[in-house]
UniProtKB/Swiss-Prot annotation:
Protein name as it appears in the record: Interleukin-27 subunit beta
Superkingdom per UniProt: Eukaryota
Gene3D superfamilies, sorted: Immunoglobulins
Family per similarity comment: Belongs to the type I cytokine receptor family. Type 3 subfamily.
Length: 228
């Protein structure tokens, strides 16, 4: 399939009402995906490595990107650790662009070369990593939950996150959810003394761009300080 046809498909997809950030790939090509867990510092992209048929040689990849679907726009290298790497990084994200990024991943193997294209808007693929350091403090019937923003989220004071909690008492079959919460602490009232709880936290961009993170690891109860 020619690059011109790929570009035509990408332009059509980006203008269609049901447009999502889905790779436009030739038959038997890897599906390329990108996410912005480090917004706005970078967008990270990855794809499934290919093994050329009847060959022991590994496939190498050339990854480039540009802002906009027009072919006359200048392409830049998507940063890879090596030609065989199956992931790359787009640095210095252009914020709130009205045109999509176009990522072109070309697989080069002994049988030839073929390309896959992915069109995306950076804000639509924001997905923070899970919050970190979730911990629990008990005080009678109150259970305080504390956590930190994901370390990979570079500017939490500027590009703020909001959080949701889910919790259940040991033995319960369903989680209850609380949120959204803009602080990094929340107190559950009327908790059962001495009961054990599974509590997890999820993060999302404050302005609802993209998707929520996966749930964090369950919170750990802090040890009471030793009295001298």
């Amino acid at each position: 399939m020619s690059k011109l046809l790929f570009l035509s498909l990408a332009l059509w997809a980006s203008r269609s009402p049901g447009y999502t950030e889905t790779a436009l790939v030739a038959l038997s090509q890897p599906r390329v995906q990108c996410h912005a867990s480090r917004y706005p510092v970078a967008v990270d992209c990855s794809w499934t490595p290919l093994q050329a048929p009847n060959s022991t040689r590994s496939t190498s990849f050339i990854a480039t990107y540009r802002l906009g679907v027009a072919t006359q726009q200048q392409s830049q290298p998507c940063l890879q650790r090596s030609p065989q790497a199956s992931r790359c990084t787009i640095p210095d994200v252009h914020l709130f662009s009205t045109v999509p990024y176009m990522l072109n991943v070309t697989a080069v193997h002994p049988g030839g070369a073929s390309s896959s294209l992915l069109a995306f808007v950076a804000e639509r693929i924001i997905k923070p990593d899970p919050p970190e350091g979730v911990r629990l403090r008990t005080a009678g019937q109150r259970l305080q939950v504390l956590w930190h923003p994901p370390a990979s989220w570079p500017f939490p004071d500027i590009f703020s996150l909001k959080y949701r909690l889910r919790y259940r008492r040991r033995g319960a079959s369903h989680f209850r959810q609380v949120g959204p919460i803009e602080a990094t602490t929340f107190t559950l009232r009327n908790s059962k003394p001495h009961a054990k709880y599974c509590i997890q936290v999820s993060a999302q961009d404050l302005t609802d761009y993209g998707k929520p993170s996966d749930w964090s690891l369950p919170g750990q109860v802090e040890s009471a300080p030793h009295k001298p």
